[in-house]
């Protein structure tokens, strides 16, 4: 498959499909135990699919544009079409948006999902470390993204988790987008490679040296890189306050 494709709109109904990793490979089953498969149900019964990742036993992080009135999270999954014994399906009690989330610009496209109960941490379900508030993922860094999104613009979603290696590039490459701010976002994906994220991958993590530095946020309609990821480090103080219940 090519690279990770982004979920570009707000929420896509399941009948429309959701996109996945482009230019990547199928992940080794349960090798990324922090990954979460997020389902958001609309008032009309449509289901939007996003990625997410476990940052504390009772909290999953995903993109703000993936949030909705009724949500469930599946942890410990590799093939989401199967009932794997490792899976834990938990309803979302509530979602917490940052005070400065901007719907139109997608700045601060991050949300915390508080689960109705704590996840049972196992070899297939575990938390991922976050960066420090001053940690700044820099251009040239090689990172990994993963998700269940489409493998191509005209292809269906993937039932198994896929991953792709992506390079952080300079902010100049993301000037093609109407809204981009390097202090809040990360520009990811080289134009010389057929690798990126797309619909259905939204909300998934960007891991650099084992640390979650970004969240799949938005990209181009043709699925060509670069793509925009929300930068996590500026939100770490807020994240810590939410987890502590402050």
Swiss-Prot record:
| Highest rank taxon of the organism | Eukaryota
Q: Which PROSITE patterns match?
A: TRYPSIN_DOM, TRYPSIN_HIS, TRYPSIN_SER
Stretches assigned to the Peptidase S1 domain: 21-244
Determine if Isomerase is one of this entry's keywords: no
Give the enzyme's main class according to its UniProt record, as a single word.
hydrolase
Task: Provide the residue ranges of the propeptide in this protein.
Answer: 19-20
Any signal peptide, and if so, which residues?
A: 1-18
Which InterPro entries does this one have?
Peptidase_S1_PA, Peptidase_S1_PA_chymotrypsin, Peptidase_S1A, Trypsin_dom, TRYPSIN_HIS, TRYPSIN_SER
Query: What residues sit in the active site?
Result: 65 (charge relay system), 109 (charge relay system), 202 (charge relay system)
**Is the keyword Membrane assigned to this protein?**
no
Question: Which family does the entry's similarity section mention?
Answer: Belongs to the peptidase S1 family. Granzyme subfamily.
> How is this protein named in the record?
Mast cell protease 9
Name the gene: Mcpt9
